[in-house]
Swiss-Prot record:
Physiological role: Excises uracil residues from the DNA which can arise as a result of misincorporation of dUMP residues by DNA polymerase or deamination of cytosines. Therefore may reduce deleterious uracil incorporation into the viral genome, particularly in terminally differentiated cells which lack DNA repair enzymes.
SMART domains: UDG, UreE_C
Organism: Gallid herpesvirus 2 (strain Chicken/Md5/ATCC VR-987)
Record's protein name: Uracil-DNA glycosylase
Catalytic residues, chain numbering: 153
Catalysed reactions listed for this entry: Hydrolyzes single-stranded DNA or mismatched double-stranded DNA and polynucleotides, releasing free uracil
EC number: 3.2.2.27
GO molecular function ontology, one term from the record: uracil DNA N-glycosylase activity
Transmembrane segments annotated in the record for this chain: none
PROSITE patterns: U_DNA_GLYCOSYLASE
Start and end residues of each stretch annotated as Disordered: 35-68
Biological process annotations from GO: base-excision repair, AP site formation via deaminated base removal
Membership in a protein family: Belongs to the uracil-DNA glycosylase (UDG) superfamily. UNG family.
């Protein structure tokens, strides 16, 4: 291509002409030879990873399409979010918690958290199952909560997490952290009947809210869902709960749990207890934790009645 004569042009005009000249050179480049193959695009394998087990139950193509549509509808535009009834039915949330949970779930932040969970659940095996993420709402109403035990995130091994912090269903081996918790209960109440299982549903029915600061986890990857945003939701729920129900004992176990609730200087209606996480890896042995007795001493003093820490019906 012939050289261009740019004499007499302004600097701006020279830039424009120069750009056009470069573009013309691109167009003039010879095409690929007929026998020269086009470079192949790299594509990732279609579908979920090998061995993936869906937490959604129905894995048919039509179910996937409906699932993706429901994710997209969670955040429709800047401010449109799903109504309470749809969210409550989708996650099996008890109606008793509507007043506390509706403002946190039926808003932009809440819809973003749920949408991020749903997005991950397409390609990850997530615990607990979707219908158990809010299982903690199904055992006692907010006004009946006497104690809140806050942990980190659910167990990441198959068959363990079922929506109650630290708890496992009957028949499942008791995890090390829960063993330490039960040892601490025994130290406070030697006569407590703890049976031979790790299911803490009996505590939940007696007003103990067993809540993780992060409500979901990827299989085999503890801490993997910290960026979903559950912590914002949990902090706000505990703040609302503390403002509507008097005389609650907050047991915050571990550094992460201790960021979920901050007692204000003027709020002496509640008791806040802090201790290291019950994991065997913690520096401080959890078996010496006296929170269970301290909780009952406080509840008895304010007339709310002690908690039976046994695991019998």
């Amino acid at each position: 291509m012939a050289q261009l004569d740019l004499t007499g042009l302004t600097e701006t005009s020279k830039m424009i002409v120069g750009e056009c000249h470069v573009e013309l050179k691109r167009c003039a480049e010879p095409p690929l030879a007929a026998d020269e193959p086009m470079p192949k695009k790299c594509r990732r394998p279609a579908g979920p990873p090998k061995g993936f087990i869906s937490t959604r139950g129905d894995t048919s193509p039509s179910s996937d399409n409906n699932h993706i549509h429901s994710i997209q509808s969670l955040t429709n535009g800047d401010s449109c979010v799903q109504p309470w009834d749809i969210i409550a039915n989708a996650y099996n949330i008890h109606e008793n918690w509507k007043q506390l949970l509706l403002p946190e779930l039926c808003c932009l932040r809440g819809s973003e958290i749920l949408a991020e969970y749903e997005r991950r659940a397409i390609t990850e095996e997530v615990y607990p199952p979707k219908m158990d993420i809010f299982a903690w709402t199904r055992y006692c109403a907010p006004e009946s909560v006497k104690a809140v035990i806050v942990g980190q995130d659910p167990y990441a091994n198959p068959g363990q997490a079922h929506g109650l912090a630290f708890s496992v269903k009957q028949g499942v081996a008791i995890p090390p952290s829960l063993k330490n918790i039960l040892l601490a209960v025994k130290a406070c109440y030697p006569s407590a009947d703890l049976g031979n299982h790790g299911c803490l549903e009996a505590w939940s029915k007696r007003g103990v809210l067993l809540l993780n600061s992060v409500l979901t986890v990827k299989r085999g990857d503890p801490g993997s869902h910290h960026s979903v945003g559950w912590q914002f939701f949990i902090r706000n729920i505990l703040r609302r709960l503390s403002s509507t129900t008097r005389g609650i004992v907050f047991m915050l176990w571990g550094a992460q749990a201790q960021t979920m609730y901050f007692q204000t200087d003027y709020d002496d209606r509640h008791l806040v207890l802090k201790y290291s996480h019950p994991s065997p890896l913690s520096r401080k042995p959890f078996a010496t934790c006296t929170h269970f007795k301290e909780a009952n001493d406080f509840l008895s003093k304010i007339g709310r009645g002690c908690i039976d820490w046994s695991l019998t019906a």
